[in-house]
Regions:
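Residue-identity detector for glycine
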Residues: 56, 77, 120, 143-146, ...
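Alpha-helix capping at helix-to-loop junctions
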Residues: 91-99, 117-120, 131, 135, ...
Length: 189
């Protein structure tokens, strides 16, 4: 899959990633992505669990999220900005601004353009949705600090243009390359 010697070592060290199409739960995935922005996995999981608890056992509908008082959502541990972003995503579903069937057929760049129109969804979040929700095979997220750190650690590259050039050599499997680079940071041994 990769001619890159660094990635070849990582492929031998870690099990193959299992990317699953999770687009059936697109609202859930977007909300989870927003809550996870700029947080550790543990903190994000805690806040997300508190958020889910507000609605009982079943994940809320966009309408239920819009009906909930902002302060109740804030009490889960979200900033005012994140509460606003969560409501913005819910509103995009209620107003049918998000058409999942259409998004699934769009190019990666068109998906990014469409999703980033929604307050709170930037390029990084859209790229994570492409990789982990829509199972797109060839996404490289230069905006991801973890990926940049892994590239710096494993390749000694700090220049963004050089990182992009390196990632070009991983086409058409850049999503898989990203996954292995993330794993390299999680497991020090």
């Amino acid at each position: 899959m990769f001619n890159d010697p660094v990635l070849k070592k990582l492929v031998k060290k870690y099990p193959a990633p299992k990317f699953e199409d999770r687009s059936a739960n697109f609202f859930y995935e977007l909300i989870e992505s927003i809550i996870s922005q700029q947080l550790s996995i543990k903190a994000a999981d805690t806040i997300f669990a508190r958020f889910q608890t507000l609605f009982g056992k079943k994940f809320p509908t966009p309408t239920q999220v819009l009906a909930l008082d902002d302060e109740k959502i804030r009490a889960c541990g979200m900033s005012y900005a994140k509460v606003s972003y969560v409501k913005s995503v819910a509103n995009a579903f209620v107003s049918e601004l998000i058409d999942v069937a259409k998004i699934k057929k769009q190019s990666d760049e068109d998906v990014i353009a469409e999703l980033t129109q929604i307050k709170g969804i930037g390029r990084w979040t859209a790229e994570m949705i492409l990789i982990f929700t829509l199972k797109r095979p060839d996404v490289f997220s230069l905006g991801d600090l973890g990926l940049r750190n892994a590239i710096t650690k494993l390749y000694g590259i700090t220049d963004r243009k050089q990182m992009i050039a390196l990632a070009e050599t991983w086409k058409p499997y850049r999503s898989t390359a990203c996954w292995y680079l993330w794993r390299s940071l999680e497991n020090k041994g």
